[in-house]
Amino acid sequence: MRKINPKKKEIVSELAQDITKSKAVAIVDIKGVRTRQMQDIRAKNRDKVKIKVVKKTLLFKALDSINDEKLTKLKDATTGQIAVLTSQLDPTEIYQMVQATLTKASPRGGEVAPADITVEPMVTGFPPGPMMTEFQKVGLQTGVEKGKIAIKKEAVLVKKGEVIPKDKAKIMAMLDIKPLEVGLELLGLYSDGVLYSADVLSLTPEKIAEQMAIGYAQALQISKASMFFVAEVLKDLIAEAKVKADAFAVAAQFITEENLKEFLAIANRNAIILNNELNKGNTTEKESEKVEEPKEAEKSVDESISEGLGSLFQ
């Protein structure tokens, strides 16, 4: 039978005791957290939380030894390199503390770019020499200004989603470019029989109020669309029904006391249109008569002259 390492057994026992005595226990991902940063996190929060970096297998043994079915669900949230936080703080306070550990950092190489990483035109603090070649190797256009290496043109070093190569990570560190956000990442938190996710704990009163307002508006829209009568939409539904009924009555030429004025207005408009059309026709006829009248006048004058001459010879 394989013997259990006494040191590991001690770690499991201490961890189980810490979890049992604490109001809350949280599992955090520590991937990317540098040693110095972890030391600073511990120093700043020494009076608030106890942070223990452990292997998953030891954590699982500690959870199993407590015999709390709900607590063991923390296993489902455990992945990657982890640390266990035990505290008497409320869940929201622990979440805020964890979020406060996030800091900007330059990559070391091998990380995934969270967004396009660009280098702006600048005058660096490096004198001309071998460093200029290093800049050019990663695709930067360089020159010399004021006795220093200058980046002449903006360039995208790494595109979003790409793995950051070590040579480009080195250049970012030299230029103090910090595209990464490094710190503790909350994976799961257990307190008073409830298992919390980071998404739940990230909700603020303002966010909750905003989401409630959005949900309320969507519920009203669904209620209207499905003709589900509730007090909140009843007035709107009645108003919409009246508008549709009025439009139907007009289309069917069904005259009521409410739409009489509208029918009169329609009749008036139609009368004006008809009158305009008739006036156009009369104007055309009069113009054609005016064109013919001179010919008739000329003809009557000739006839008068003929009649006058005829009377002289009678």
Swiss-Prot record:
GO terms for cellular component: cytosolic large ribosomal subunit. The keyword Ribonucleoprotein applies. Residues 282-314 are annotated as: Disordered. Keywords: Ribonucleoprotein, Ribosomal protein, RNA-binding, rRNA-binding. One of its GO terms (molecular function) is large ribosomal subunit rRNA binding. InterPro entries: Ribosomal_protein_uL10, Ribosomal_uL10, Ribosomal_uL10-like_insert, Ribosomal_uL10-like_insert_sf, Ribosomal_uL10-like_sf, Ribosomal_uL10_arc. GO terms for biological process: cytoplasmic translation; ribosomal large subunit assembly. It holds the Pfam family Ribosomal_L10. Forms part of the ribosomal stalk, playing a central role in the interaction of the ribosome with GTP-bound translation factors. Part of the 50S ribosomal subunit. Forms part of the ribosomal stalk which helps the ribosome interact with GTP-bound translation factors. Forms a heptameric L10(L12)2(L12)2(L12)2 complex, where L10 forms an elongated spine to which the L12 dimers bind in a sequential fashion. Belongs to the universal ribosomal protein uL10 family. This is Large ribosomal subunit protein uL10. It comes from Thermoplasma volcanium (strain ATCC 51530 / DSM 4299 / JCM 9571 / NBRC 15438 / GSS1). The gene is rpl10.
